[in-house]
Amino acid sequence: AMARLLEKGEGIDGVFASNDLMAVGAMAAIEEAGLRVPEDIKVIGFDDSVVAQTARPALTSVRQDIVALGEAAAELMIAQLRGEEVVPRILKSELVIRETA
């Protein structure tokens, strides 16, 4: 997907991927196109997984408490199964700034 975006040449200066693995894939496509991360295109992932910490350059990523996410998902699912009103929740997240943004 990143390679196709770069082929269009529409002046992309940043990418926010839906997870860290996709962000690392975007970084590879950016480098294959002869561009540099973060000098030419900044990249941010989502998960703050081990992938983000070991990527080179180290990946900036959004960290979310997966335990809290799992608990909230289970509570909402149980409420829905019981026929109770399901109220959306907003969970806290944190931007972990590293070398790619």
Regions found by a protein language model. Give the residues of each.
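Structural motif
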Residues: 1-8
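Flexible loop/turn connectors
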Residues: 8-101
